[in-house]
Amino acid sequence: MLKRILAALSIGIAAPVVSSAPAAAQSPAATMLDAEARQDVVAKVSAALRERYVFPEVGEEAAAKIGSALAAGEYDDLADPAALASRLHADVAAIAHDKHLRIGAMNAPSPAPAQGPAPSYRAEAGVVRADKLAGGIGYIEVTGFPPPDFFKPVLDKAMAGLEGSETLIIDVRRNGGGSPESVAYLVSFLIAADQPVHINDIVTRVAGTNDFARESFHSLPTPVSFAGRPVYVLTSNATFSGGEEFAYDVQALERGLLVGEITGGGANPTGPVEIGNGVVATIPFGRAENPVTKTNWEGRGVEPDVAVPAADALKVALERLGQTPVADIAAASQQQVFAPRSVPLAGSEAAVRQLVAGATSGQPDYGAMTDQFADLTRQHLSRAQTMFAELGELRSVTFREVDMMGGDVYDVAFANGALVMAVLLGPDGKIAGGSISPSAGPGS
């Protein structure tokens, strides 16, 4: 029961915080699906496709395909939620060809990386490091675009450290995306601040209709500016979503040279849909539209101006700038001017204890949360209360690390088990995000 609740909570309340628990520890036991449950899953996925998918005709076609497959008995042997989800994903992907559209199972283990474990690194609000290199070159690596309230202060600090650089290298080779508003803010450092520049639009489908709404993103004033200075953007085939948007925007505005690989090819913003029966889905509800090109990079990726293997992108950029060509930023750096925070924010441990106490009693302090996080907490309160009742008395809260999005991660021990809890505090000190996952230790 506890593992099942944890799965629901990790899906439901994970806001901008990324859980740090190993994937293997997050796999609850599967509950087999009977015919009625399979029918319910297909019905809910179909409804989400018809009502929310950004391209209504494609959503209708995909929904019809899985409905026909169900009626033909093609899913009759798929009692395991992971097996059903995998087949549904394959059937829908064959129609939509959308990398942001995903159907999966809570109990499915994460696949092992094809080339061994991914290299570990620390980031704060998506910023890994900023360095001054020889030749007046500034370097910054950005691996994600969290909401602007969290991204801006960290980016401002990192970019201030690069002030005076004659050339800028921005590394998004490991960037998986995020907020389009934060993408626009990073672009803002590269363009003149005399008047706002239209950077990107997100065209969103109004759920249940064929109507669309448009949100435009423009440049904003920045504390330092690199307008008019040469810019190099490093890309890889792992650069995705918002990371791709940044590269695409820079290219469309003719504000930099892209060096590296064609990016992943995902331009449609997505959101979670509650399916139930151990199945989860993310359904793209919008599309990016660049005001210069009137299109985006969906399905194609962003073409670099200088195509080289991602591992060589920094080396090639440095060589083009007349510097010693090295692939490792640590070797190229003369001075690291920004490093991620490695200690918890004041108040984050108290926030974790407050969340535990509120969920245990069934009376959270919603006034200590942002409105969005308070709404999510209300939705999942009964499950959280059941979980904490099973865990028993709180014994200890021990800081572990700062996660990639700037959340503080803690090991939380109880009388009957342990959790990994992350909490994200907003600029006003309110709890703005959080996640719960099993501990990797004994008894988890």
Spans of model-derived segments:
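Bacterial N-terminal signal peptides
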Residues: 8-17
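Short, low-complexity N-terminal intrinsically disordered segments enriched in polar/charged residues
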Residues: 29-41, 325-358
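Terminal peptide-recognition signature
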Residues: 45, 92, 140, 170, ...
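Extended, small/polar residue-biased N-terminal targeting/export presequences
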Residues: 56-135, 376-386, 392-398
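Short, well-ordered alpha-helical segments enriched in acidic and aromatic residues
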Residues: 62-68, 355-377
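Solvent-exposed loop/turn segments at secondary-structure junctions
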Residues: 107-110, 144-148, 174-180, 196-197, ...
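Gly/Ser/Thr-rich loop/hinge elements
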Residues: 177-230, 268-274, 286-291
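Surface-exposed, charged secondary-structure patches
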Residues: 383-433
